[in-house]
A protein has these predicted regions:
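Short, conserved loop/helix-junction motifs that constitute active-site signature segments
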Residues: 79-85, 118-119, 142-144
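Active-site-lining helix/loop region of Rossmann-like oxidoreductase modules
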Residues: 145-266
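Rossmann-fold NAD(P)-binding glycine/threonine-rich loop
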Residues: 91-141
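Rossmann-like NAD(P)-binding element
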Residues: 47-98
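Phosphate-coordination loops involved in phosphoryl transfer and adenosine-cofactor binding
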Residues: 2-4, 84, 147
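NAD(P)+-binding Rossmann beta1-loop-alpha1 motif at the extreme N-terminus of oxidoreductases
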Residues: 1-45
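General beta-strand structural signal in soluble alpha/beta enzymes
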Residues: 52, 122-126, 175-177
């Protein structure tokens, strides 16, 4: 039986994830906080394997529930409806958009924060450490020499296997980064976060040339061995969290131009 991916969030990342899922033959139920009617154009582009639904409908239908959301949105997630579900946590902590004292004090990781709210769900961290464009463009079929390895973290082996199989199906090899408590090793500021999956933009380009290069240039593959080494050598960053200033300027310019005001504010 074909599995269904329920997606809560239909922005840049949610749209890229939905495209990868339908390309791999998964059914997708895409939702957002504004209602199914606001996703009709995207769903039409995605084809017959995708449909729009309410958040509750996406949760009910999904074998995996993906959260391509700002971290600040986690408290609005319906914990009761998500009970028993495997949740793919794609959120990241960026304090300039939303601040949390427990995260700042290293009391827990961002995925532990999500798991605490979704106390009866099984949270797996993954598909969070690159942007929407490269999430889609870096995907490769099994056996391709350019296939990338990405990390996951979580506390439940069965849920990890389910998510790992999904990620392999949509174009990635997977390395286990440990528990949610250890997921700081793959959070913003860690060696495996973002930069290995984005192209290096050369000096001397105009702003438009930088953007085009960033979107179109090939990225060298991250092998499983390289991914493991990056995870193992990670040192917990302090202060914690990502910043736009630490990102490639071309990425920031494209993100701010395309992202919704709701995303930027959070």
């Amino acid at each position: 039986m074909t599995q269904t991916i329920g997606i809560i969030g239909s922005g840049l990342v949610g749209g890229a994830l939905a495209r990868l899922a339908v390309d791999a033959g998964y059914n997708v139920v895409l939702s957002n906080s504004r209602g199914p009617e606001t996703i009709s154009g995207l769903v039409q582009e995605l084809g017959p394997l995708a449909r729009a639904g309410t958040v509750d409908e996406a949760i009910a239908a999904g074998d995996i529930i993906a959260l391509p959301l700002p971290l600040a949105s986690f408290e609005a997630l319906p914990a009761d409806k998500l009970a028993g579900k495997v949740v793919l946590d794609q959120t990241n902590y960026y304090p300039e958009f939303w601040r949390n004292a427990e995260l700042d004090n290293l009391a827990l990781t961002s995925s532990e924060l999500v798991q605490r709210h979704l106390k009866d769900s099984i949270v797996i961290k993954g598909l969070h450490n690159f942007d929407w464009n490269h999430m889609y463009s870096n995907a490769r079929p099994k056996g391709d020499a350019e296939r990338m390895t990405i990390p996951v973290a979580g506390d439940d082996d069965d849920a990890k296997r389910l998510v790992t199989q999904f990620l392999k199906s949509i174009g990635y090899d997977v390395v286990d980064a440990g528990s949610l408590a250890e997921s700081w090793r793959i959070e913003p500021g860690a060696p495996i976060y973002f930069w290995p999956y984005a192209p290096v933009v050369p000096d001397g380009l105009t702003e438009d040339e930088e953007k085009r290069h960033y979107l179109e240039a090939p990225v060298p593959p991250v092998t499983t061995e390289t991914a493991r080494k990056m995870i193992d050598r990670a040192v917990r960053p302090s202060p914690v969290g990502g910043t736009l200033a630490s990102m490639p300027p071309a990425h920031v310019a494209i993100f701010l131009a395309l992202a919704s005001g709701n995303t930027v504010q959070k």
